[in-house]
Amino acid sequence: VTAALPPNKHQEKSLRTRALLLDAALDSLADRGYGNTSISDITARAGVTRGAQVHHFHTRTELFAHAIDHLVVRQRESLHRHIGQLAPDTTPVEVLIGLVTATFAGRLGKAAIELYSSFATDDELRHTMLRSQHEITIELLSTCTELIGDTAPRDRLESTFWLTVNLIRGTTVDEMLGRDERRRRQVVDDWRTLATLALATD
């Protein structure tokens, strides 16, 4: 079997431009929302010409369709960065909340919610979005289970994981609506206390 040749400089530049456009699309989604995100805003953020954008993505819809998988790439990178920052004595609850937050909160979380809502009436894109987010969520659950190990009962860990995912997504929506940040922090703190009890061994 012949090994794949490394990309040449032209290919590398093309891949960089593509990534810049997709990153800019996610940033614009987080800042402006799907309805207000324009091609001109995306190209300006990416620092590329409209011609370069058309070369990679002919339409706005095509660009956002590819942004779905790119979002997962960035979520996975954020997850792995957080894993690398975990201290050896990090508690199971802090592992759980920290990893879920790294994956589903912040700017990436906002971009994901915008994509969810914008694809509500497009069956194909909605299916793609649901599939990709399900895959990263299952990967996240597996990672949490591996890191936490047998320090918490498996059934409780899975239940606490899914509740944490829903809570973090909910606080992200709350942030997008401009609600009270102190209240969001209090909600997460309250959940940290409850989750600690849920994961405690008998």
Across the structure, where does each feature detected by a protein language model lie?
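Short, basic, alpha-helical segments at the C-terminal edge of helix-turn-helix-like DNA-binding modules
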Residues: 69-75
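Amphipathic alpha-helical packing segments from all-alpha helical-bundle domains
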Residues: 76-77, 81, 104-113, 123-149, ...
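Hydrophobic/aromatic-rich alpha-helical bundle segments in the mid-to-C-terminal region
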Residues: 125-130, 147-202
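N-terminal intrinsically disordered/low-complexity leader segments
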Residues: 1-16, 177, 202
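An amphipathic alpha-helix signature
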Residues: 22, 65, 97, 134-145, ...
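Helix-turn-helix
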Residues: 20, 24, 28-62, 66
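Hydrophobic alpha-helical connector segments
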Residues: 62, 66, 77-109, 160-164
